[in-house]
Amino acid sequence: MTEPSPHPADSGPAATSKRDAGGETAATLPEAKGRSATAQAVTINKPVSELYGYFRNFANLPAFMENVVSIDVKDDKLSHWVVKAPAGATVEWDARVTEEQVDRFISWTSEPGASVANSGRIEFRDAGRRGTVVSLTILYDPPGGIIGKIIAKFAQREPAIQARRDLNRFKQLMETGEIATSAMNRAQREEEMA
């Protein structure tokens, strides 16, 4: 039997208001960093342990996180992230796991000196026969402040946009083993050229 949740099964994280980026959202994240907030949730038809296990191996994340170029896992708590930014640039930071409970949640924060100060939490809640509700909350400081955030949004590289897309790709990958795309793969292009 699953423990009762204060949230409906498919609801997003409790604190999703951009107006309260420093309030309840930050209160749920140890060592919270960032003034902008985004929160997303998706139900994935897989058991909690499978989803948690895949996500906890941070080297797996570039497989479904479109803007993540690479993640170098340094140890059980520390990893180095390289992420695409607008205008062909990249941003980098070291992230440290600040708190976790196996099969329940992982919280992290960027280390001092990060080009994008950020922190976040991903939660995995049993949804019975429907699988697992995966909720993601991210706090971040966009490079360039509000202007940088607008540019990132225009370039489709803003974390709120990416979080939604990345969770949907995570769902596709875990449920079907692949991520749907409108792009042709090499074999399809060669077949069409023949």
Where does each model-flagged region fall?
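Hydrophobic-ligand binding "helix-grip"
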Residues: T2-G12, D72, D76, H80, ...
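Hydrophobic ligand-binding cavity/cleft-lining segments
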Residues: T2-L78, R164, R169, L173-A194
